[in-house]
């Protein structure tokens, strides 16, 4: 775009004032004329419409009156003695004379032709039908088209002379004495070229001409041929009265016997007076426009003589300010408005000069480097701070290596800013320092005239960020090492716990003395307590790493309450503590949330309540709050006890990790101090809330609220196989391959399997298991995870992919991470058991195996 094209054409003040006058007066004058023209046009059109309606009604009335008169004569003639005698005597001469005398007495209401019929056919006609090309057979055919009533019928007949449009009616000829129908009298009016009818309509309707059309084809008209228009013009202009024309065409549809026909009467009237009035309106508007232009020109001349001189001095003052010749005072003007403008401009120029000085000071004394670049990447202006950093002492020393290297790195960003982008946080070094630059395009009248670049020294910040990233990576490495350590410790601790709990279960089944059973229970409870502490530590570690998974599904809350009661009622009875469970939920209601995490929350809270209540009562109250219109219900569980209670100033700390009320509490009651922390985090993950109330020595109450979805469920009866004894679960002895590297775990699992009449082969690692499977077939494979040589997951893949075996594989792992279970299932396992393996969990696994594989097989 050239500079010339950017400049707009300037106009003088007189021209602008003239335009203003025109713009003000023109709408007013034009508005008046347009409004006048509009209302006049509306009145004219209303008058035209009224004229059209009146003319149409008059023409239709004349047309109907004409045929009504013919109908009256026809009805009267049919009762004449001459016609009655003709039916008996057939005296045609008398009949012809009768009709001739009638036609001569009233020729204006005479039909074009007549004929009489009896029950055999036509017995007489006046012979006029042949003049219209209608022969005897056509005449006979017309009788079949008029079969009902005495009304007129519109009939079109194709003759040798072309189409003929007729109005035809009949009346019965009755024998006066008996009333018998002797025959019918027919009258026919031919509309084609019926000049007499058209003249009658023209004269009586007071119109210039009349045209009768059928299907937009002219049938008859009153045009004499000396008019300035033809029938074609009338047809072309009918119903096209959107603009006023010299001819006013009125269209009148013809109804015959209450039925719409294709006949229409077009009347023509002279409309010259209305057209003349319209032309006069246009001429008046044109005259007003010419007058307005003349006034504008005279006004312009007067303004130029009166105002231009004073305006010239004002323009001269503004030009001097634009040319930056220095600040000057305005000399004043005789015109008050111009003097005010000049004084205002003087104040404005003075303020602008002060702002320029302030900007120069800000630019020159700023501690941060500031530069102005052109769109082409040429340095336009630079402040002293930037000169110092870039080692530029004067404008010609821009080839210094420091500046050259800086410019090479900055140019790509300058190009982006030249396209209109605003760039922030661009790091470009100068020597050993790192500066963060902001680049912003300078826009003038929508076009980019330059780019301002501002920098900030962030060398110290960059170094601090490096140290922070290094510390973060070290912390992540430490957290990962701790997670790996906990995972390994989980496996190493769970393995001996598995042996302790497994042997305790086996011993309890093999002894009969009550004292020995109690001792074994102590051993088992101690192992389970150790396992609970380990689980708390592992769960807390997962929460810290964000690896705790929430998996929601529908389940029966009543089943959860039943399980909780079965576990803690015996414990409460042994302590002499009353356990009260109040479940207000309907037994047929399922709730939708994470069952495992809900169990963990409730078991932790009930376990704490039982643990810290030496005597008294532990109460659990559950109810479901439902709100109208809400998507979710709210499960409210309140767990209260009459235990030792908590000091009020310690309540806020109870959900912190490794916190108990006092150090002696841990020694007296045990625990990891993580239970409430895990509860708080699980409740938050389920979008719920947990509150605590307590008084020292009086007890504690925890209230858990969780949003859940609820629905009715159909309770299915428990499968009988879940209630049978181990030895009766399977109908035949099953062959099981146990893959386990730990002798203790293998011993316990083999002992459990023996109760189910299973034959167990023991493989100590994955490679040995592969050899067993090549030589033998098995009903079930129990697969450990951490095996020497070939791990459990890898062994499972080998069995599925290389050996192509579909033998059910039930994995046994001490790793509680969800990733491990998912990896086993992805490799081809059918079930995952967590160590330490309890007898009930193993029983459920065997029930699952029977239902999924043995029942399907049979």
UniProtKB/Swiss-Prot annotation:
Residues 488-710 form the Histidine kinase domain. Keywords: ATP-binding, Cell inner membrane, Cell membrane, Hydrolase, Kinase, Membrane, Nucleotide-binding, Phosphoprotein, Protein phosphatase, Transferase, Transmembrane, Transmembrane helix, Two-component regulatory system. GO terms for cellular component: plasma membrane. It is a multi-pass membrane protein. PROSITE patterns: HIS_KIN, RESPONSE_REGULATORY. SMART domains: HATPase_c, HisKA, REC. Residues 735-850 form the Response regulatory domain. The modification 4-aspartylphosphate is found at residue 784. It catalyses: ATP + protein L-histidine = ADP + protein N-phospho-L-histidine. The chain crosses the membrane at residues 14-34, 362-382. It is found in: Cell inner membrane. Its EC number is 2.7.13.3, 3.1.3.-. The modification Phosphohistidine is found at residue 491. Binds the complex formed by the autoinducer and LuxP. At low cell density, in absence of autoinducer has a kinase activity, and autophosphorylates on a histidine residue. The phosphoryl group is then transferred to an aspartate residue in the response regulator domain. The phosphoryl group is transferred to LuxU, and ultimately to LuxO. At high cell density, in the presence of autoinducer, the kinase activity is inactivated, and the response regulator domain has a phosphatase activity. This is Autoinducer 2 sensor kinase/phosphatase LuxQ. The lineage of its organism: Bacteria, Pseudomonadati, Pseudomonadota, Gammaproteobacteria, Vibrionales. The gene is luxQ.
């Amino acid at each position: 775009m050239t500079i010339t094209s950017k400049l707009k054409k300037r106009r003088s003040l007189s021209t602008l004032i003239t335009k203003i006058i025109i713009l003000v007066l023109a709408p007013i004058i034009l508005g008046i004329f347009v409004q006048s023209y509009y209302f006049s046009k509306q009145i004219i059109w209303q008058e035209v419409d009224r004229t059209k309606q009146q003319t149409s009604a008059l023409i239709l009335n004349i047309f109907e009156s004409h045929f009504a008169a013919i109908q009256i004569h026809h009805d009267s003639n049919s009762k004449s003695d001459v016609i009655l005698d003709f039916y008996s005597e057939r005296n045609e001469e008398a009949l012809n004379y009768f009709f001739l005398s009638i036609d001569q007495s009233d020729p204006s209401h005479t039909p074009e032709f007549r004929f009489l019929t009896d029950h055999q056919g036509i017995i007489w006609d006046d012979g006029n039908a042949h003049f219209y090309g209608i022969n005897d057979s056509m005449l006979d055919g017309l009788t079949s088209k008029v079969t009902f009533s005495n009304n007129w019928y519109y009939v079109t007949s194709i003759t040798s002379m072309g189409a003929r449009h007729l109005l035809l009616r009949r009346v019965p000829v009755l024998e006066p004495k008996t009333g018998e129908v002797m025959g019918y009298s027919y009258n026919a009016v031919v509309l084609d070229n019926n000049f007499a009818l058209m003249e009658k309509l023209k004269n009586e309707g007071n119109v210039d001409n009349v045209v009768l059309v059928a299907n937009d084809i002219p049938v008859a008209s009153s045009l004499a041929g000396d008019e300035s228009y033809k029938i074609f013009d009338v047809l072309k202009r009918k119903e096209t009265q959107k603009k006023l024309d010299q001819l006013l065409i009125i269209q009148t549809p013809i109804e015959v016997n209450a039925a719409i026909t294709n006949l229409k009467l077009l009347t023509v009237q002279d409309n010259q007076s209305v057209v003349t009035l319209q032309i006069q309106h246009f001429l008046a508007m044109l005259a007003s426009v010419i007058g307005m232009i003349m006034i504008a020109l005279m006004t312009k001349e007067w303004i130029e003589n009166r105002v231009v001189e004073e305006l010239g001095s004002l323009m001269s003052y503004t030009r001097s300010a634009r040319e930056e010749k220095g600040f000057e005072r305005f000399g004043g003007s005789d015109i008050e408005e111009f003097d005010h403008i000049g004084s205002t401009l003087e104040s404005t120029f003075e303020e602008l000069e002060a702002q320029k000085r302030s900007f120069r000071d800000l630019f020159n004394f700023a501690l941060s480097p500031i530069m102005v670049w052109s769109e082409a990447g040429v340095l336009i202006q630079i402040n002293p701070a930037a000169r110092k950093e870039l080692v530029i002492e004067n404008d010609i020393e821009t080839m210094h290596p420091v500046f050259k290297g800086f410019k090479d790195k900055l140019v790509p960003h300058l190009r982006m800013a030249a396209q209109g982008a605003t760039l922030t946080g661009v790091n470009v070094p100068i020597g050993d320092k790192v500066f963060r630059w902001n680049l912003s395009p300078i826009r003038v009248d929508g076009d980019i005239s330059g780019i301002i670049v501002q920098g900030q020294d962030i060398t110290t910040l960059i170094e601090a960020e490096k140290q922070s990233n290094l510390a973060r990576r070290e912390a992540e490495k430490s957290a990962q090492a701790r997670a790996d350590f906990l995972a390994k410790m989980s496996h190493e601790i769970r393995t001996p716990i598995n042996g302790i709990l497994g042997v305790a279960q086996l011993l309890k089944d093999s002894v009969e003395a009550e004292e020995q059973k109690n001792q074994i229970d102590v051993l088992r409870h101690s192992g389970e307590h150790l396992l609970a502490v380990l689980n708390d530590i592992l769960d807390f570690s997962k929460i810290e790493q964000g690896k705790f998974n929430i998996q929601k599904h529908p389940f029966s809350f009543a089943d959860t309450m039943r399980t909780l009661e079965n576990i803690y009622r015996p414990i409460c009875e042994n302590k002499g503590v009353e356990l009260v469970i109040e479940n207000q939920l309907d037994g047929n209601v399922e709730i939708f949330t994470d069952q495992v995490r809900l169990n963990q929350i409730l078991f932790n809270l009930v376990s704490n309540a039982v643990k810290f209540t030496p005597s008294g009562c532990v109460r659990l109250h559950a109810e479901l709050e439902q709100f109208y219109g809400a998507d979710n219900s709210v499960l409210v569980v309140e767990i209260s006890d009459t235990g030792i209670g908590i000091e009020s100033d310690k309540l806020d700390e109870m959900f912190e990790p490794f916190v108990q009320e006092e150090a002696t509490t841990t020694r007296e009651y045990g625990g990891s101090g993580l239970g409430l922390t895990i509860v708080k985090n699980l409740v938050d993950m389920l979008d719920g809330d947990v509150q605590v109330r307590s008084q020292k020595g009086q007890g504690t109450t925890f209230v858990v609220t969780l949003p859940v979805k609820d629905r009715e469920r159909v309770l299915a009866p428990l499968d009988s196989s879940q209630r049978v004894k181990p030895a009766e679960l399977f109908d035949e002895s099953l062959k099981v391959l146990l893959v386990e590297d730990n002798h203790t775990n293998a011993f316990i699992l083999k002992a459990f399997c023996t109760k189910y009449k299973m034959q167990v082969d023991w493989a100590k690692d994955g490679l040995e298991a592969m050899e067993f499977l090549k030589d033998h077939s098995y009903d079930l494979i129990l697969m450990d995870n951490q095996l020497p040589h070939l791990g459990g997951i890898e062994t499972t893949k080998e069995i599925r992919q290389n050996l192509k075996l579909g033998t059910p594989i039930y994995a046994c792992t001490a790793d509680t991470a969800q990733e491990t279970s998912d990896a086993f299932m992805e490799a081809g396992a059918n079930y995952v058991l967590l160590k330490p393996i309890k007898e009930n969990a193993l029983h459920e696994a065997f029930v699952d195996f029977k239902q999924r594989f043995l029942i399907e097989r049979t």
